[in-house]
Swiss-Prot record:
GO terms for cellular component: outer membrane-bounded periplasmic space. This is Outer-membrane lipoprotein carrier protein. Participates in the translocation of lipoproteins from the inner membrane to the outer membrane. Only forms a complex with a lipoprotein if the residue after the N-terminal Cys is not an aspartate (The Asp acts as a targeting signal to indicate that the lipoprotein should stay in the inner membrane). Keywords: Chaperone, Periplasm, Protein transport, Signal, Transport. The keyword Signal applies. Residues 1-22 form the signal peptide. It is found in: Periplasm. InterPro entries: LolA/LolB/LppX (IPR029046), OM_lipoprot_carrier_LolA-like (IPR004564), OM_lipoprot_carrier_LolA_Pbac (IPR018323). Monomer. It comes from the Bacteria.
């Protein structure tokens, strides 16, 4: 009888845990869905696994639901991450190189796209827990380079900051400021490599 009671208690706790994870994921998606368009400047802080600040940067973030995402880092080195909903582009103007990946294959290592995604197949690649206005996402696949992805978004759907923590403990924190909700053209989320840019098209692999 005692073993049966313990087993029942364990199953109950497991069920409650799964329910809490589902509720956190639903709450996060609901909050993100409240804002269809967002533009903001960001300040980036890179911190080593030992807690040392190793780099500061800045740039601009633009998102448009569903599935459109653009993040341009201006300093210390210009880079662009652009999603048109199907392809995710990583562009480095300094070395004139761009990598193209299918969004569905990139979510595991690039959780930024979740900020605008309604696709359950994307969200199922992460577990979600909630700590007030901060949501902690952890990849379900061990092959991910990301240890966790934190999103701070308030009850009105305003995105305040987000961060990635890599397996070696390095953290990239992006704090948003000068947030606006002005209309954005879909053309901002299109990318066409210029002549001379080397393209690593991983969609063909």
């Amino acid at each position: 009888m005692k073993k049966t009671t313990l087993k029942f208690a364990a199953l109950t706790l497991l069920g409650l845990s799964n329910l809490a994870l589902a509720d956190a994921a639903s709450e996060l998606q609901m909050r993100l869905a409240k804002v269809d368009v967002l533009s903001a400047e960001f300040v980036q802080t890179v911190t080593s696994g030992s807690g040392k600040n190793v780099q500061q940067g800045s740039g601009k973030l633009q998102i448009k639901r569903p599935n459109l995402f653009r993040m341009e880092t201006k300093t210390p080195q210009e880079t662009q991450i652009i999603s048109d909903g199907k392809t995710l582009w990583f562009y480095d103007p300094f070395v004139q190189q761009v990598t193209a990946q299918w969004v569905k294959n990139a979510v595991n290592n690039t959780p930024f796209v979740l900020l605008t995604s309604n696709d359950n197949s994307h969200w199922h690649q992460y577990t979600v827990t909630q700590q007030s206005d901060t949501f902690v996402l952890k990849p379900t696949l061990s092959t991910s380079n990301i240890k966790q992805f934190d999103i701070r978004v308030d009850a009105n759907g305003i995105l305040r900051n987000f961060s990635t923590t890599e397996k070696d403990g390095q953290t990239n924190l992006y704090v948003l400021r000068n947030i606006t909700n002005q209309t954005l053209s879909d053309s901002l989320f299109q990318f066409k490599p210029e002549k001379g840019v080397e393209v690593d098209d991983q969609r063909k692999k």
